[in-house]
């Protein structure tokens, strides 16, 4: 399978399953329900869902520009809230695939806060600053949700100081910055997050 990780990857909390175009690369535990990706995007689902979706089948009907829409028992619903990853749960499901994803991606986000992020950079480093604490997830084998920490990874060096994180990339990275005010059936779309590419030490905003 080929993936466009820059645009096609969303992540969330504890994992029920990881799927791509209807092909399970993990295991879904949703009271016997099933999930099918229909638009060619990857989604990882948390250990909670909208209150009306405790059982039954879920069919994803569209995953685009950061938003998820799905069909639950025939009703059209918006996507789940996306927040920081719980790495151990993901690693048990599809470690080889997630290694491939996370070696080229950095994810920043934290549930329950409204954070104003901005990015600046020079030729040697990328810096992201936040007015609030945030969660940095670089590699599912090494990083635990809720921590901001210093790690030396195979494709990047991450050095964090308080609310500042510097990236010294050895390749192109993608930074997902999430506005974390959305809950439940709110659409999670391009109006509520920014996506940046880190190329040659500088972040470039992607139009979504």
Swiss-Prot record:
Instruction: Classify the source by domain of life.
Output: Viruses
This chain belongs to the protein called: 23 kDa protein
Native species of this protein?
Pea early browning virus
């Amino acid at each position: 399978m080929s993936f466009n990780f820059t645009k096609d990857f969303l992540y969330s909390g504890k994992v029920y399953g990881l799927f791509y175009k209807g092909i399970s690369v993990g295991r879904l535990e949703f009271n016997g329900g099933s999930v099918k990706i229909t638009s060619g995007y990857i989604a990882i689902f948390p250990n909670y869902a909208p209150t009306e979706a405790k059982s039954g089948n879920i069919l994803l009907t569209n995953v685009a520009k950061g938003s998820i829409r799905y069909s639950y028992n025939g009703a059209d619903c918006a996507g789940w809230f996306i927040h920081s990853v719980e790495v151990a749960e993901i690693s048990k499901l599809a470690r080889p695939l997630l290694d491939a994803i996370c070696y080229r991606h950095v994810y920043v986000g934290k549930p329950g806060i409204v954070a104003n992020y901005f990015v600046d950079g020079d030729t040697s480093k990328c810096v992201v600053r936040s007015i609030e604490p945030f969660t940095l997830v670089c590699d599912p084998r090494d990083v635990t949700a809720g921590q901001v920490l210093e790690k030396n990874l195979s494709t990047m060096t991450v050095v964090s100081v308080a609310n500042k994180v510097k990236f010294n990339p050895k390749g192109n990275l993608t930074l997902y910055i999430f506005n974390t005010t959305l809950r439940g059936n709110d659409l999670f779309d391009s109006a509520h997050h920014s996506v940046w590419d880190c190329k040659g030490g500088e972040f470039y905003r992607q139009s979504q």
